[in-house]
From Swiss-Prot:
Taxonomic classification: Eukaryota, Metazoa, Chordata, Craniata, Vertebrata
GO cellular component: pi-body
Transmembrane feature ranges: none
UniProt xrefs under CDD domains: SAM_ASZ1
Organism of derivation: Felis catus
Domain SAM: residue ranges: 272-334
UniProt keyword terms in alphabetical order: ANK repeat, Cytoplasm, Developmental protein, Differentiation, Meiosis, Phosphoprotein, Repeat, RNA-mediated gene silencing, Spermatogenesis
PANTHER family assigned to the protein according to its UniProt record, in alphabetical order: ANKYRIN REPEAT, SAM AND BASIC LEUCINE ZIPPER DOMAIN-CONTAINING PROTEIN 1
InterPro entries: Ankyrin_rpt, Ankyrin_rpt-contain_sf, Asz1_SAM, SAM, SAM/pointed_sf
Main location: cytoplasm
GO BP term, example: spermatogenesis
UniProt repeat feature ANK, residue ranges: 45-74, 78-107, 110-144, 148-177, 181-210, 214-243
Localisation: Cytoplasm
Protein name, per record: Ankyrin repeat, SAM and basic leucine zipper domain-containing protein 1
Disordered: region residues: 1-24
Amino acid sequence: MAAGPVRGLAVAGGGESSESEDDGWEIGYLDRSAQKLKGPLLPEEKNETFKKALTTGDISLVQELLDSGLSVDSSFRYGWTPLMYAASVSNVELVRVLLDRGANASFEKDNQTILITACSARGSEEQILKCVELLLSRNADPNVACRRLMTPIMYAARDGHPQVVALLVAHGAEVNTQDENGYTALTWAARQGHKNVVLKLLELGANKMLQTKDGKTPSEIAKRNKHLEIFNFLSFTLNPLEGKLQQLTKEETICKLLTTDSDKEKDHIFSSYTAFGDLEIFLHGLGLEHMTDLLKERDITLRHLLTMRKDEFTKNGITNRDQQKILAALKELEVEEIKFGELPEVAKLEISGDEFLNFLLKLNKQCGHLITAVQNIISELPVNSHKIVLEWSSPRNFTSVCEELVSNVEDLSEEVCKLKDLIQKLQNERENDPTHIPLMEEVSTWNSRILKRTAVTVCGFGFLLFICKLTFQRK
């Protein structure tokens, strides 16, 4: 069976660049009809014709060249073999022919295996899956890593191929292996936003608590890259998918994971989680999932829960242990407030300078807390509306409140400027007042200067008398 023309570029798999832009292959979109050898060819001509046949996907010409004695594991420029090239463009029929002719499925060049090349190929998942399956059937090792310690499952997860991930695990791929940066397959999937791969890996027992070298978990990596659906899902304390398929046999796993029904099921599971409201997300984050049904039965919203008193907690059947978790979370969410009732009455004329300065410092600190709170909110909000997980009310409500905030901030700025001008005026008048009595600090400074000058003068006279006395004694 002849394969259609190849429409793709020959690139080094796994994101590893070639040592040169010209690796001896014809790069581009080629569509050539099948060719036949017109006569005997020199070895150099055979190699060149072989490369062209591989580039165009001309199966019949490839077979004819192999029949003429050309090695199936011929090493082209920079060490690529025909099978590695065929895998890099996901040409299933070409991969099959080369393997049937004895091509080495375990070949590697500079820690770049053919399986890694296939998993990182540019093509449809269906084509990549078939190529990977052929290579695994010829005992290609799914746990051999490249120079960056990335294994085939990491490349498949990074590029968003859940079925390829499942197939690799079914053939013994380690789910929780980490690369040179501490990334696992789950971390790569979370980083790239591939939710179906995330779910598949969790089913296969991926550890969502493994950290990268800079101390980040997959959920934190997802959050940093604005994949909030994945972040919320991975943040759940309990996960009904975790390790779901670990106890199945190899054959059962392949059958289970390569069916279209499983994809529909996982989409349903994920959508049920991402449809959670703010109450469910809050409870899952605290490990209080068991309270969800209880609160829903009593029509208790998150706003109501966060404003409950001690007696209301008990009345609604919330245990002391759960109460402590909620109260601890509330304490972390609180913004430090100034208790203005404890501050001095600024209007009183007898207020001390220290008290007034303390008031201004606390006011400034409060403004700093408010600025930090707003900055944190801005950094957490998704850039695109389709990434918002929780159900929000009309955006107009938020815009209206923000407009009021801006107005209040402008009013505050105006009042602070008035206060500053008033203080400056008082300071200028005070300095120009002839009846102004210097502060003790100023008086003590002046006295110390006089004392120092007096001491120097006395010492000077003493030294002069000593010189005179010494002179008289010598005479």
